[in-house]
Amino acid sequence: MIRRIGVLTSGGDAPGMNAAIRGVVRAALTEGLEVYGIYDGYQGLYEDRMEQLDRYSVSDVINRGGTFLGSARFPQFRDEAVRQVCVENMKRRGLDALVVIGGDGSYMGAKRLTEMGFPCIGLPGTIDNDVAGTDYTIGYFTALETVLEAIDRLRDTSSSHQRISIVEVMGRHCGDLTLAAAIAGGCEFIVLPEVPFSPEDLVCEIKAGIEKGKKHAIVAITELVCDVDELAKYIEKETGRETRATVLGHIQRGGSPVAYDRILASRMGAYSIELLQQGYGGRCVGIQNEKMVHHDIVDAIENMKRPFKGDWLDTAKKLF
């Protein structure tokens, strides 16, 4: 029987993580459970930095970006001896289960703890929207609004100077954030990690647009596809049009979460408590067709693939 649980946030922060923590804490307390907040992710778990949370611990956090528990990269967690210390710390504190909020790397940590006999539930918290088993991740919609605002502002200055603007968007190997922002922002060109990219082909498309009378353009590109500064130099050289690259960077992770992220995080947090009380461990929570779902965390990490929104890209191309 579950009586006391821990909750931590891990990996890159995402707007809505605080709402998720609040959902976990409030739902657990309603069911008569005790909750301990673990500071700075798996590193804090290893260092035994945790404290009991009550209803007031999560008051006035639903609107705050980031995570008040903190987060940290902790590669040492791959070491089984380090993980054993974490398990011993949780057992000494009387914890029966752990809720982990983060991306696929955080899920891997939860998987390893589950394999050591400690039940964990994973909640998808990342702006990249790259976690399998869920339509959307906590933080994605807030980041989308942040990127869209930046694109709108870039369009203002690009049109004034008849300039080509490249905007680099986060996402790692997933282009969901770039694609959605590009459609909403009316970007003329989209470069995604899921689609083979050729700078030469992009230049041809830009030149075709110029021949049709296009006086400015915005190229939305996901990070890590290429060096955007070098791409800007190449485009300017080949087209004769002033071209500038803007890397949005970590600004995409910040800010007060939008309504949908707050609702999603609250639902997922509460649902994690339902699963634990039903005896589940080694599961990850998702939302599919607006319904809460859960999957085996090993399956989500190793076997499930996020579907590429090819139909969205087809739509975007029709609108250029």
From Swiss-Prot:
Q: Where are the active-site residues found?
A: 128 (proton acceptor)
Q: Where does Mg(2+) bind?
A: 104
Summary of activators and inhibitors of this protein? Allosterically activated by ADP and other diphosphonucleosides, and allosterically inhibited by phosphoenolpyruvate.
Going by the UniProt record, its keywords in alphabetical order are:
Allosteric enzyme, ATP-binding, Cytoplasm, Glycolysis, Kinase, Magnesium, Metal-binding, Nucleotide-binding, Transferase
Q: Could you tell me the EC number(s) of this protein?
A: 2.7.1.11
Q: For this UniProt entry, what is the primary localization, expressed as one broad class?
A: cytoplasm
**Lineage top rank: taxon:** Bacteria
**One protein family per Pfam:** PFK
The compartments listed are: Cytoplasm
> Which HAMAP family does the record associate with it?
Phosphofructokinase_I_B1
Record's subunit section: Homotetramer.
For this entry, the protein name equals ATP-dependent 6-phosphofructokinase
Specify the species: Pectobacterium carotovorum subsp. carotovorum (strain PC1)
